[in-house]
Amino acid sequence: MSDLAYKRTNVYEKADESTMKAIFDYAEGYRKFIDGAKTEREACAFVEKAAKKQGYKPFAFGKKLKPGDKVYYNNRGKNIYLIRVGSGNIGEEGIRIVAAHIDSPRVDLKQVPLYESDGVALAKTHYYGGIRKCQWAAIRLALQGAVVR
């Protein structure tokens, strides 16, 4: 019966040196991404730059694509699509879609946010994603984003 029991293992105790190096190298790449992509627009720019390094070209509507083509489409700097054209028969083999969602926690101010209450200046915010207002008192904030006129 002990063979079926769940045993906790720690990767730091079990992994060899090359595996640990691969783990930390991957984590360092992720750290660079989250450091350089704090908003959706920054994430799109980051991904576009990385895609260009991998040989992706801008997508052009009406241009015929051929197997092996790698193109990207940046939709107004808010989302990006990467496309690698395969060589198989779509009707028989189908297509593979890999999707990722950019979710940037933030305080999103309304168009005219400032108001005063009880002698204190406050800001009206949009509420997305379930972030509690009390969480923001515990972390450093940066002012980033786009100004809308």
List each model region and its residues:
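N-terminal hydrophobic/helix-forming segments and targeting peptides
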Residues: 1-149
